[in-house]
Amino acid sequence: MEHLLKTDPEVFDAVVKEYERQFYNLEMIASENFTSLAVMEATGSVLTNKYAEGLPGKRYYGGCEYVDVVENLAIERAKKLFGAEHANVQPHSGSQANMAVYFAVLNPGDTIMGMDLAHGGHLTHGAKVNFSGKLYNVIHYGVNPETELIDYDQLYKLAKEHKPKLIVGGASAYPRVFDWAKMREIADEVGALFMVDMAHYAGLIAGGVYPNPVPYAQFVTSTTHKTLRGPRSGFILTTKEYAKAVDKSVFPGIQGGPLMHVIAAKAVAFKEAMSEEFKEYAKQVVENARVLAEELKKYGFKIVTGGTDSHIVLVDLRNKNIIGKDAEKALEKAGITVNKNAVPFDPLPPTKTSGIRIGTAALTTRGMKEDEMRKIAGWINEVLSNMDDEKTIQRVRQEVRELCETFPLYPELKRRIDELRSGKATDL
């Protein structure tokens, strides 16, 4: 970071402050994680200088022999990790991965089915404010009001009635497992294609603790930065039948040159996810979430669906008479970072919400386990029971800081920053 400090002290200062925020706070936003230093090194490598439109061996630029090596590694590792016939690792994000699949098999005005955003779905699954809701005729399925689990009977009835061309599975705030086999069965019966957006669950699937949709879906999309613990990006898995259509849809359909430095980081992340250590990590992520959910229930919090099968704990705050927006702010003051989130059949708008979404992926990366989850549940209860008590909030803030120091984040980076700040660095 010495070059950044010398060239642009203002950006250096902002980066360091963000590092310190991550270090001294409990990052519990379910879509966030901490990459390895190897992933960050790949992202910051000389590959950022290279244009490489096209696919390995079929580029529109010269000098691509080494970026071809990198992209082929990423492709083969993604296929092996998830058991897929074909992978495209060029999408810049999960949203663009979804767009590429839509553009590959749909025409404007076609009918698609996706999970209602208010029930845990994602913007790109047909929300009105998103391109997917503007270009396509969207029918939403949701959860049962009693169990808060996906209502497959409703999904089936809607599919029979509306005959969608594509059914989309996956979510951004659904803590339980999906029945991929049942969804594929419904899709086949109505003549629909089946796509799964596994962005939130990809790392858990790679680790073998969450059902793999690849055997059931013609298309599987994902980000790489959530539970998969890679760079901020996306990828697509598909069958040989749809490989050419997907590749053409990504380039030249919706993107130009791929980000080769990010593809290198994806290759690294896929390799890391193949390890036994990663399998243990994924298992611990889910165990931490389950313990956190059970502890919060002991304090009287209502957990949506009654628990979790993943890294997500969705808390309905209505029985506590707390608005999600206020809970998010109070917890942030205490050093606990979560996000306000709608709960099923939420009467409040998304700017306020009746719930919060909590995730365990990032803290598990830091090495925290069940005992820490119990402690954190207690802090969440203390803060949300005393939201106007500054003394309580500051006491919890100090205790959070002490816990974070026990599980240091990127200690090598901290030492380097300290050297640069003190002027002791010798290679400026």
UniProtKB/Swiss-Prot annotation:
EC number(s) stated in the UniProt entry for this protein: 2.1.2.1
A cellular component term, taken from the record's GO annotations: cytosol
Top-level taxonomic group: Bacteria
Annotated compartments: Cytoplasm
PTM sites of type N6-(pyridoxal phosphate)lysine: 226
Disulfide cross-links: none
UniProt-listed InterPro entries: PyrdxlP-dep_Trfase, PyrdxlP-dep_Trfase_major, PyrdxlP-dep_Trfase_small, Ser_HO-MeTrfase, Ser_HO-MeTrfase-like, Ser_HO-MeTrfase_PLP_BS, SHMT-like_dom
Keywords assigned by UniProt, alphabetized: Amino-acid biosynthesis, Cytoplasm, One-carbon metabolism, Pyridoxal phosphate, Transferase
Keyword check for Glycosyltransferase: no
Chain positions of site Plays an important role in substrate specificity: 225
Cofactor(s) required for function per UniProt: pyridoxal 5'-phosphate
GO MF: glycine hydroxymethyltransferase activity; pyridoxal phosphate binding
Pathway the protein contributes to: One-carbon metabolism; tetrahydrofolate interconversion; Amino-acid biosynthesis; glycine biosynthesis; glycine from L-serine: step 1/1
Catalytic activity: (6R)-5,10-methylene-5,6,7,8-tetrahydrofolate + glycine + H2O = (6S)-5,6,7,8-tetrahydrofolate + L-serine
Binding site for (6S)-5,6,7,8-tetrahydrofolate: 117, 121-123
Gene Ontology biological process: glycine biosynthetic process from serine; tetrahydrofolate interconversion; tetrahydrofolate metabolic process
UniProt keyword Cell division present: no
Subunit structure of this chain's protein: Homodimer.
Function: Catalyzes the reversible interconversion of serine and glycine with tetrahydrofolate (THF) serving as the one-carbon carrier. This reaction serves as the major source of one-carbon groups required for the biosynthesis of purines, thymidylate, methionine, and other important biomolecules. Also exhibits THF-independent aldolase activity toward beta-hydroxyamino acids, producing glycine and aldehydes, via a retro-aldol mechanism.
PANTHER family attached to this UniProt entry: SERINE HYDROXYMETHYLTRANSFERASE (PTHR11680), SERINE HYDROXYMETHYLTRANSFERASE 1 (PTHR11680:SF35)
Family, as annotated: Belongs to the SHMT family.
Protein name as annotated: Serine hydroxymethyltransferase
Originating organism: Aquifex aeolicus (strain VF5)
